[in-house]
Regions:
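Conserved short hydrophobic patches within well-ordered secondary structure
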Residues: 1, 77-79, 121
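Charge-rich, low-complexity N-terminal segments
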Residues: 1-31, 36-43, 47
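Alpha-helical interaction segments
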Residues: 15, 40-41, 91, 110, ...
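Short, conserved beta-strand/beta-arch hydrophobic-aromatic motifs that form part
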Residues: 42-102
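Well-ordered alpha/beta subsegment
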Residues: 96-131
Length: 131
């Protein structure tokens, strides 16, 4: 899988309603690709999808909190794991299939792209890769 940054034009389109999110997204993308240089990415209409080759993480403007509770700017990170995360940082969690949990985490600053978050990203990467 190629290690390429998401196309600026496609990102501008994705984040057109909240362009202040782009630096936050770029910081997350950089950390993720530094940790997993073999990860692929696709900029889609509503999200950026990270693959290995299965999807293990997404970045989007999904409203995982009430609008009044969202930071400005914000980015929602979605991770697929084999268990439910027990953390106040998780805004929403669901089990769409037995043994597969989808977690949505809203971040509002680069400081929130920390060791804890990137440990969960790594766990999601390994979970998707080893399926």
């Amino acid at each position: 899988m190629p290690n390429v940054e998401a196309d600026d034009i496609e990102l501008a389109r994705l984040f057109q309603d909240m362009p202040g999110t782009i630096p936050l997204y770029r910081a997350f993308e950089t950390c993720l690709l530094d940790q997993h240089p073999d990860a692929g990415l696709r900029v889609q209409k509503t999200q950026v999808t990270f693959t290995c080759p299965r999807v293990f993480a997404c970045a989007s403007l999904l409203r995982a909190r009430r609008k009044a509770e969202l930071p400005d700017p914000y980015l929602t990170i979605t991770l697929g794991l084999g268990h439910r995360l027990d953390s106040p940082r998780v805004d929403q969690a669901s089990e769409p299939y037995p043994g597969r949990w989808t977690h949505h985490l809203v971040i509002g600053s680069i400081d929130e792209i920390d060791n804890e978050l990137m440990t969960w990203v790594d766990e999601a990467y390994r979970f998707a890769r080893d399926k």
